[in-house]
Amino acid sequence: MKTLLLTLVVVTIVCLDLGYTLKCNKLIPIASKTCPAGKNLCYKMFMVATPKVPVKRGCIDVCPKSSLLVKYVCCNTDRCN
């Protein structure tokens, strides 16, 4: 009984994500990646002239300001970009 309980505890610890890790979409290949420590935002960058076609996606620490040519959209939930 103790062995079974210990096994369940170990499996639970291994399966749980003890520290929150953000997952953001990448552009190429279309997949997600786990963000490193300190990068707590997902971002999507696209040209203002073609707002439906993202140019870059990934993890970032601070959302950059958009300009006349480039727009950034940032968010803080898994795969939100």
From Swiss-Prot:
Annotated compartments: Secreted; Target cell membrane
Described purpose of this protein according to its UniProt entry: Shows cytolytic activity on many different cells by forming pore in lipid membranes. In vivo, increases heart rate or kills the animal by cardiac arrest. In addition, it binds to heparin with high affinity, interacts with Kv channel-interacting protein 1 (KCNIP1) in a calcium-independent manner, and binds to integrin alpha-V/beta-3 (ITGAV/ITGB3) with moderate affinity.
MF-aspect GO terms: toxin activity
Pfam families: Toxin_cobra-type (PF21947)
This protein's UniProt keywords: Cardiotoxin, Cytolysis, Disulfide bond, Membrane, Secreted, Signal, Target cell membrane, Target membrane, Toxin
Family statement drawn from the similarity comment of this UniProt entry: Belongs to the three-finger toxin family. Short-chain subfamily. Type IA cytotoxin sub-subfamily.
Biological process annotations from GO: killing of cells of another organism
Signal sequence region: 1-21
Tissue expression profile of the protein: Expressed by the venom gland.
Predominant cellular place of this UniProt entry's protein: secreted
GO cellular component: extracellular region; membrane; other organism cell membrane
S-S bridge residues: 24-42, 35-59, 63-74, 75-80
Subunit structure of this chain's protein: Monomer in solution; Homodimer and oligomer in the presence of negatively charged lipids forming a pore with a size ranging between 20 and 30 Angstroms.
Protein name: Cytotoxin 8
InterPro entries named among the record's database cross-references: Cytotoxin_Cobra, Snake_3FTx, Snake_toxin-like_sf, Snake_toxin_con_site, Toxin_cobra-type
CDD domains: TFP_snake_toxin (cd00206)
Taxonomic source organism: Naja atra
UniProt key word Disulfide bond: yes
